[in-house]
């Protein structure tokens, strides 16, 4: 038993290994090198450190401490050198005794977490060991003995239940229901339930009868108890419920039945294990998968805080870990020690499980990242990044671009703002160029003020407001021609001029504050460009007003002075009438010369203006390209968004289709499950009806009206009445005829002798068996045997009783028709029925599904049966049985000098075979035992008083059944024949066949036959398959007993062939009525 270190028990409750704890508690840190100076000792100042016993112990154990105590291994504190004597026998014994108590018995190790026992120990599975009761006959009274063995006839059991308390408990607090359920006696359980016994009585381990039935895998009894209302959730002293034991046994069908009857799937035992956690801990993958389908809690914790995943990792089961990870279980959960599943996998070096956990974590990260990504948000971020890039190209400084741009939430709004900004900048540029606002020296990029060449007394028109409006109109026309895309239909020239001036003032203010110039798509305008554009505007105006001969263009370009007007407009001038203006001749000449100079300058300025105009157009084209590029990127993002939305809608449709298919599958599975449950209910009702009819017939039927049951075997014939527990007549199936006429003079000589009479006169008779290897070969002799059965053995008239005859499997159709014809035409029976011998043997064991290995005197059959129907395609026949064994025994006895030749001596050998022979579990080992010892030899006294010794012949004779080569036969043994028959059956019923292998016939009565069959079939079957050999004590007559049960049913009258039906249809009716 492994020690669990979840909590430190009290000092008085810990088992003291050979009295050392009481002696060593205070000397520990003095006696063991690994504990010196550790400060862990409980020794006080008055501790007796010089005790002689502890000195001796210290001298012996000083160098072995590190190797003898699990808590000190690997601590590096031992004084043992490389040459230390680690194999001393005394220390080996001490280490074996003290290893598991170390952390409880030595104060220095408590809580040190150095023990190799484990941080949280392991679970005690003693609750699941030895499920069946240990029963002694002297401890049981009559009722309990009958419930345990189930050998009491039904009538006697019914009478016994009337006179006894059905709830009486024995010394172990077991009721009759406990014993019958644990041993699988379903008939007794049925009777007890009909008597309304208490269902939830607890034995000495607080287990109900239902728990014992589930624990011992007696499914039929468990289902009966569940139907009558037994509580499946009552825990035993270990805290285990019925579902825990079903999971431990990997009995998925029983677990399903328990859940249908309300078993708690989340119940915990004293270790905190739910059925799911128990299945994981025991590495029962199939039931774990079943519980997951039944929605068991995957996050349940045991008392150490461990989840199913941590338990699977600790057990090293990669398949269960993979199964749990498919359910999206939490891999980050920690137990009470703070460790996760991955940490346990790493510390235990489970590399495959580590890889599974790593792959699962990567998949989860990818899934989370894909869920967080949103197509609309991606499109929005794309447009914002593009807008920010466009904005950054304008606002960023030449030396360093900003690494954290401001993200705008609306990409379209930002594009519109950019376009408005460029529009306002362009308009402001043109207006500032034409208006000449603010004074400067030319260094700051402003228009320099030119000196006026007009005389001081020069006259100007009085209508200054009209000039102002004409200038505004001129500027508006120019803007419409140069930038039609950025102008608005309802724009006001005065507002545009005013806004442009304000923006230019803001730009100038930014220049004065030392801000670097903006890196935008529009080219830098220098002083010369300003002057050229100004002159171009002036020339255009002069062309319109040249007829007036007034110097208005000059005044237009030179009239603005620094500091005149903060609003950026041209200040008004004093009006002068042209009529009063007079120019002297010198002034006229000067005027004409100035005019010519101005004309030349204007021509040059026109060329420069054209160049400037081309540059402006190129700049506008660049702006258009930028805007088109942004629009294309936005359209591409919109297309991607549409594609993602389309893909999303497609995925939703696929998910909907998958959900529909899943619902359809669930519905179909529910329908199948419902159908299976209905079939189970119908089978149960049918069985109940059969049992009730059997009980009724047992109480009412007497010998005068009972059916006659005749089992025709190759060597023996068994006959009796339906309802009896055993046949009334058993005699050899032989017919003897005198070898010579008149040999028996003085006596009334018969033509033939049958049965025991023929065997007693075998010395003068020729004996014949009318049935060879299970098939009737001589119908005249067989008719004599039946006549002897009716009139001599049973002493009844066959015309007054229905008859049930047995036949071997695969009996020819002609033989079946001949049997029917003889019964109705020769013996005039009122009704008859023919039943297969293997099916009747299975009925005797209380089952309807299983495989029967029937070995009698002449033939051996292995017959798989499903729901009472034999499977002919999987039935195998072996012409090896009990009749060949006496001849083989006579042969091997001659090796020791014993010679048997006559028919009488052959009967002596047959008696030796039946009384002394047995089946060896291991033939080779048994032969070696006989060669070295005489313990297996037995003595046999012959009729003349001579005593002979039988040695290895005892088990060599029946070994021929498993190794036919001993007889010179080239065929499989009975175990291989049984296995081959199971493998020929359908895959779905093989498990039921393995667990319900029934032995039948006289040849299977050898001691050790069941254990040898268990061993041999287990070696041939799959390793995980459970093998169960059923060997009834009276299997020699199991065929006849099964016929007695069948003929006792009230429904048997519906099964048999009546005389009227035979007269109407003839012998062939046997094929329709007797399947």
UniProtKB/Swiss-Prot annotation:
**Region of interest (Disordered), ranges:** 369-530, 544-596
Is Protease one of the keywords?
Answer: no
Q: Coiled-coil segments, which residues?
A: 399-435, 642-698
GO CC annotation terms, alphabetical: actin cytoskeleton; actin filament; axon; blood microparticle; cell cortex; cytoplasm; extracellular exosome; extracellular space
This protein's superkingdom?
Answer: Eukaryota
Stretches of Basic and acidic residues bias are at 377-392, 401-424, 466-483, 495-530
Q: Where are the ANK repeats?
A: 172-201, 205-234, 238-267, 271-300, 304-333
Chief location category = cytoplasm
Family statement drawn from the similarity comment of this UniProt entry? In the N-terminal section; belongs to the POTE family. In the C-terminal section; belongs to the actin family.
Q: Where is this region: Actin-like?
A: 702-1075
Q: What else is known?
A: Results from the insertion of a beta-actin fragment at the C-terminus in the POTEE paralog gene leading to the formation of a new functional chimeric protein. This insertion occured before the divergence of the Old World monkeys and apes.
Its name, as the record gives it, is POTE ankyrin domain family member F
Composition skew (Polar residues), residue ranges:
485-494
